[in-house]
């Protein structure tokens, strides 16, 4: 089954790296990229995202704020917060809103594990 994944990171290099890893794992999935939370929200009105990879540190709203907004609109959406800033508080806040924390640099293995769990979560929600 094909899915659409939202990748939000203010670093173009980080977005490209995540998109490349995603393409290697699931070449038929659609990847939509945004540089800020505001850009992602504005894209959401014209796109239907199945899951999201969100950078934690971004200008304006951070990834956790965006994740909370996305979860409010779609509670079953699998979301990963991606950051090099591996603090227990950030991990706990991500978990509290139902998001997964992934450490930067994002590896294909870590991304693959998140995506497998995300697909299982989506299938369970659609039953």
Regions found by a protein language model. Give the residues of each.
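Two-component/phosphorelay signaling modules centered on CheY-like receiver
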Residues: 12-32
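Acidic, metal-coordinating helix/loop segments flanking the phosphotransfer/catalytic sites
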Residues: 33-51
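Acidic catalytic/metal-coordinating carboxylates
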Residues: 36, 62-65
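Short amphipathic alpha-helix used as the core "switch/output" element in two-component signaling
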Residues: 42, 64-76
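Active-site residues of response regulator receiver
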Residues: 55
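The feature encodes the CheY-like receiver
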Residues: 59
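Alpha4 helix (beta4-alpha4-beta5 surface) of REC/receiver domains from two-component response regulators
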Residues: 65, 86-102
């Amino acid at each position: 089954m094909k899915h659409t994944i939202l990748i939000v990171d203010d670093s173009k290099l980080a977005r490209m790296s995540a998109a490349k890893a995603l393409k290697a794992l699931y070449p038929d999935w659609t990847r939509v990229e945004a540089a800020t939370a505001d850009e992602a929200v504005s894209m959401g009105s014209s796109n239907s995202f199945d899951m999201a990879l969100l950078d934690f540190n971004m200008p304006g709203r951070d990834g956790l704020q965006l994740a909370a907004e996305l979860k409010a609109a779609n509670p079953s959406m699998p979301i990963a917060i991606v950051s090099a800033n591996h603090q227990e508080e950030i991990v706990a806040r991500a978990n509290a809103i139902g998001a997964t924390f992934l450490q930067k640099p994002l590896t294909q293995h870590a991304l693959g594990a998140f995506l497998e769990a995300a697909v299982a979560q989506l299938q369970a929600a659609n039953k």
